[in-house]
């Protein structure tokens, strides 16, 4: 039982040391992540279309 209490006290201690982002930083980071995901979505979609077009060109 003492091990569990010690573990959770350690977790609480470490969580208090953590620096959490402000609302502004969180919003900024969220925009960056969503923009990056959309960029790669469009990139790989265009790549897929291009590969399929080349395949159709060569294979008929």
Swiss-Prot record:
Entry annotated with the keyword Thylakoid: no
Gene Ontology cellular-component terms listed: plasma membrane
InterPro entries (alphabetical): SecE_bac (IPR005807), SecE_sf (IPR038379), Translocase_SecE/Sec61-g (IPR001901)
Membrane topology of the entry: Single-pass membrane protein
Lineage: Bacteria, Bacillati, Bacillota, Bacilli, Bacillales
GO molecular function, one term: protein transmembrane transporter activity
Gene field: secE
Keyword terms, alphabetized: Cell membrane, Membrane, Protein transport, Translocation, Transmembrane, Transmembrane helix, Transport
Self-association state and partner proteins as the record states: Component of the Sec protein translocase complex. Heterotrimer consisting of SecY, SecE and SecG subunits. The heterotrimers can form oligomers, although 1 heterotrimer is thought to be able to translocate proteins. Interacts with the ribosome. Interacts with SecDF, and other proteins may be involved. Interacts with SecA.
TM annotation in the entry: 31-51
Protein name stated in the entry: Protein translocase subunit SecE
